[in-house]
Amino acid sequence: MEFPGGNDNYLTITGPSHPFLSGAETFHTPSLGDEEFEIPPISLDSDPSLAVSDVVAHFDDLADPSSSQDGSFSAQYGVQTLDMPVGMTHGLMEQGGGLLSGGLTMDLDHSIGTQYSANPPVTIDVPMTDMTSGLMGHSQLTTIDQSELSSQLGLSLGGGTILPPAQSPEDRLSTTPSPTNSLHEDGVDDFRRQLPAQKTVVVETGKKQKAPKKRKKKDPNEPQKPVSAYALFFRDTQAAIKGQNPNATFGEVSKIVASMWDSLGEEQKQVYKRKTEAAKKEYLKALAAYKDNQECQATVETVELDPVPQSQTPSPPPVTTADPASPAPASTESPALSPCIVVNSTLSSYVANQAFSGPGGQPNITKLIITKQMLPSSITMSQGGMVTVIPATVVTSRGLQLGQTSTATIQPSQQAQIATRSVLQAAAAAAASMQLPPPRLQPPPLQQMPQPPTQQQVTILQQPPPLQAMQQPPPQKVRINLQQQPPPLQSKIVPPPALKMQATVLPPTVESSPEQPMNSSPEAHTVEATSPETICEMIADVVPEVESPSQMDVELVSGSPVTLSPQPRCVRSGCENPPVISKDWDNEYCSNECVVKHCRDVFLAWVASRNPNSVVLVK
């Protein structure tokens, strides 16, 4: 064969120990008869990137040191014993020689002239007429793609896999008694021997070095594990043995202690075992406390609250009122329900709603727990340890709702809704009472609601029939996306006489149209409390008038807690006297004076809700 670039570039294929291989003889194919075949020249394009030195250098690692100068090429095809000349085109040579390198032991009876590109998949047609006992000898023409070559033969079309060097013809042919019969047997045996090795090479090239595992730094606050009973005995006896034998090594001391432990009585061993058991119990307690502390400092934690018995009356959070344009404050949670402060300052909107899981009324609350050092400036702490979160973009659709557990679930909402209300509504637990002062018409506005004591108890004494407040159109929920800081909460509170209220369950809700003025008194706007099962609301003294049954008395209440009284009281706010039986006021008032004062308060509240900018004086 002749390569371009010079007349001296002839490849001499020799086999010194084989009688058929010599440079001066033509090649004979024993399997096909005595026909003579001329070796066709390989015509290569004048590609500057491909030279004879590159082809030969690629097979240098596959050649045997004892072969001749051009033995690298013969070593490549030495496994095939060169029964037939193999014609390769320029497209096959461009693959870097990785396709048939290192001992593909199939006898190729026809020249492979298929052009190959670097883009997979590539189909290779290999005639296998003479390989009857080979790997795929059942088919005369087998289609092999790139993935099969890579997985079964360990070959790579890109030439990236380095295969082990093939056995030289001298080593293989020297032990062959009959060259005619051993041509195919040697090829099949070599193929089977090299197949596992090639697979191993492919697997090894795909492995990545694993990074060494870094040991976690041990927390100094983590409790230490207790030692065993033998370790306690070792500590006790080591000092005595060292005192007697100061030159004894650690191994000698260990042997002495082991013999002493074996000869120790069972009762004495039980003493050390009891110490170990006690230490284990202390360790488990300390470990549990340590884990609880770690979980408390986690970023997000889902907690399932235990159901509160119906007989108990939990303390409700502070009752607040909000203007329509101002957001309702986020729900507050008592420290008795959670050891950590619950706050969510990253969400742009909240929906305060209580979800009950199952008929048992057991709520599931998802809480974001943040340490006290990370609390933002928008959080104000009350004296009772409660936290009120008022983010800049908090809006609610269902408002502040309080159930049997006096907690509210904070849930994110992409587009929250705010509904204005014309009647003071707030959730409360049953079987409790609370005195709160009614509002005056124009007191100085407060920038933030003062937090009442945490142990307030609220009840409702009377519930009117469901009605639309102020005879206005049906309520509508207005969607608001607050992009800027909303105005601060404003409320108007004055100390008036006390108000007596009763507790009841409200099947309906009293709503009003969102057409109320923005600067109206805050008692006309509050947050609705709803739940899937029950509706507990605190409506401050709602009593229908004789002239207009739709008129309602709305009062903002905030004051000190009062004790529960089983006896009924006068309905008028601030009156502690029991009601007098009379058909004129339905056994609800103690005197005519209370009836007149109560009607005046109701009328003033109604006028204020209708005309918030006007001042009405009733004498």
Curated annotation (Swiss-Prot):
Composition bias of kind Pro residues appears in 436-453
Name the residue ranges with Basic residues bias: 208-218
Regulation of activity? In liver, recruited to target gene promoters following treatment with dexamethasone and cAMP. Binding is decreased in presence of insulin.
Q: How does it assemble?
A: Component of the PNUTS-PP1 phosphatase complex, composed of PPP1R10/PNUTS, TOX4, WDR82 and PPP1CA or PPP1CB or PPP1CC. Interacts with PPP1R10/PNUTS. Interacts with FOXO1 and CREB1 (increased by cAMP); FOXO1 and CREB1 are required for full induction of TOX4-dependent activity and the interactions are inhibited by insulin.
| Domain of life from the UniProt record | Eukaryota
Asymmetric dimethylarginine (modified residue): where? R479
Which ranges are annotated Basic and acidic residues under compositional bias?
183-193
Which protein is depicted? TOX high mobility group box family member 4
Assigned GO CC terms: chromatin; chromosome, telomeric region; nucleus; PTW/PP1 phosphatase complex
Query: Which gene is transcribed and translated to give this protein?
Result: Tox4
Compositionally biased tracts (Low complexity): 320-335
InterPro entries on file? HMG_box_dom, HMG_box_dom_sf, TOX_HMG-box_domain
Q: Name one GO molecular function term.
A: chromatin DNA binding
Q: Name one Pfam family in it.
A: HMG_box
Concerning CDD domains, the annotation shows: HMG-box_TOX-like
Q: Which residues carry this modification: Phosphoserine?
A: S178, S182, S315, S531, S548, S550, S558, S560, S565
What are the start and end residues of every segment in region (Disordered)? 155-227, 304-335, 436-458
Entry keywords, A to Z = Chromosome, DNA-binding, Methylation, Nucleus, Phosphoprotein, Transcription, Transcription regulation
